[in-house]
Design a protein with these regions (language model features):
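Short, acidic/polar N-cap/turn motifs at the starts of alpha helices
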Residues: 22, 124-128, 200, 221
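Structural motif
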Residues: 59, 171, 208-211
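Binuclear metal-dependent phosphoesterase catalytic core
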Residues: 26-29, 190, 194-236
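Active-site-proximal beta-strand elements of phosphoester/diester hydrolases
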Residues: 30-39, 133-140, 210-214
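Divalent metal-dependent hydrolysis catalytic cores, especially in the metallo-beta-lactamase
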Residues: 65, 177, 181, 215
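Core catalytic region of metal-dependent phosphoesterases/phosphodiesterases
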Residues: 6-12, 25-31, 35, 40-123
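Non-catalytic terminal accessory segments
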Residues: 5-6, 161
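Conserved catalytic scaffold of divalent metal-dependent phosphoesterases
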Residues: 73-74, 79-173, 177-187
């Protein structure tokens, strides 16, 4: 699909209760594991962490929807898994809904100390962060609530094309949509492509990419080698 000129402005509402994207880029080198959309499934999340640890990932990043807004048990255990394994994370829409429920006094059968710790954990999550020309977000890499609610993959390349036009990221890794998918910008053309399980994706300097990792709840995660500039889809 050829990218056409977009004349309408994209306006994102402010998100006063959410930390925006981190303004100081992180320094992430070497091997990076990525997980998304575990939706409260501790078993799947820990399986992904173990698989990425076995691959000697230097850093593991969770791309949001750590929790599920309809599943309220094991919230503290989920926080412990993230913090005990030094997982970096961004906020997803389900995480935001849990945060707002706690702020609004929903009991969720939690001890007061656990409630406070979960709230602090959720409030600390940024909407996205960058490392060099690489960005990590739940969905769209912008400072608004809409950004983590609206999917990039709508079955077409329209939303991906807008992100390529409005950002300078070489690579964007995200979740929200549960099916692994690649959007590629090459010489003004955006394509939507499935991500194969067995063939590593080699990144080219003259292209830009959006990688939707897929849902850990459905057995998906990914592995990035920044030195070799490759991405591998991992299916549990």
């Amino acid at each position: 699909m050829m990218i056409e000129a977009y004349f309408s402005a994209i306006v994102f509402d402010p998100c006063p209760t959410c930390p925006p994207g981190l303004k100081h880029p992180l320094t992430l080198q070497g091997r990076i594991g990525v997980i998304a959309d575990s939706h409260g499934n501790i078993a799947s999340m820990t399986d992904c962490i173990q698989r990425l640890t076995d691959r000697r990932a230097d850093t593991i990043i969770h791309l949001g929807d750590i929790f599920d807004s309809e599943i309220h048990h094991n919230l503290m255990n989920i926080v412990d898994v993230i913090t005990d394994n030094n997982i970096l994370a961004v906020k997803g829409n389900n995480d935001y809904q849990i945060e707002k429920s706690l702020e609004n006094g929903h009991p969720m059968d939690l001890d007061p100390s656990d409630r406070q710790r979960i709230r602090q954990f959720l409030h600390s999550l940024a909407l996205y962060f960058t490392s060099g020309n690489v960005c990590f977000a739940h969905s769209r890499p912008f400072d608004s609530i809409r950004a983590f609610y609206e999917p990039i993959d709508t079955g077409s390349t329209e939303q991906a094309a807008r992100i390529f036009r409005h950002t300078d990221h070489h690579l964007l890794f995200c979740g929200h949509s549960h099916l692994p998918m690649l959007f590629r910008w090459r010489a003004g053309i955006v394509t939507r492509e499935p991500i194969p399980e067995q063939t590593p994706l080699v990144f080219q300097k003259n292209e830009k990419y959006i990688i939707i990792v897929g849902s850990a709840d459905k057995g998906e995660c990914g592995f990035i080698d920044r030195e070799k500039m490759v991405y591998e889809r991992i299916r549990l």
